[in-house]
Amino acid sequence: MAAGMKGKRSRRRKERKNVEHGCAHIKSTFNNSIVTITDSVGNTLSWASAGGLGFRGSRKSTPFAAQMAAETAAKTAMEHGLKSIEVYVKGPGSGREAAIRSLQAAGLEVTLIKDVTPIPHNGCRPPKRRRV
């Protein structure tokens, strides 16, 4: 190892992309919410999840956790110059509407909201019903 580089990791500085329009992909499951903001091609600008923000257990699946995840992802994406987004929502979770409202409140102009939840043509057998 070089004498001056001992104990230091070389880390590339994150480059600031200049993107005006992008896409927000919200995946809201029964257990978690993940918000990924990409440019129009599909390259990720920022992402955040409810679990990554410190929400654990049943608090991870709340609308408030999804709202915080969307806010965090939006702030990071707006540093890249993002102004307007198309929103693609996937999954049956409770954080869908909260995440969309949070993106609008963060100052992003929402141009499209589309539900892209995959629906099986009678594929896999669903999990058994819970008896509480």
Curated annotation (Swiss-Prot):
GO biological process: translation
Annotated keywords: Ribonucleoprotein, Ribosomal protein, RNA-binding, rRNA-binding
Origin superkingdom: Bacteria
The keyword Ribosomal protein appears for this protein: yes
Gene3D superfamilies reported for this sequence: Ribosomal protein S11
A GO cellular-component term linked to this record: ribonucleoprotein complex
Keyword Cell membrane: no
Function (record text): Located on the platform of the 30S subunit, it bridges several disparate RNA helices of the 16S rRNA. Forms part of the Shine-Dalgarno cleft in the 70S ribosome.
Subunit architecture: Part of the 30S ribosomal subunit. Interacts with proteins S7 and S18. Binds to IF-3.
Full protein name: Small ribosomal subunit protein uS11
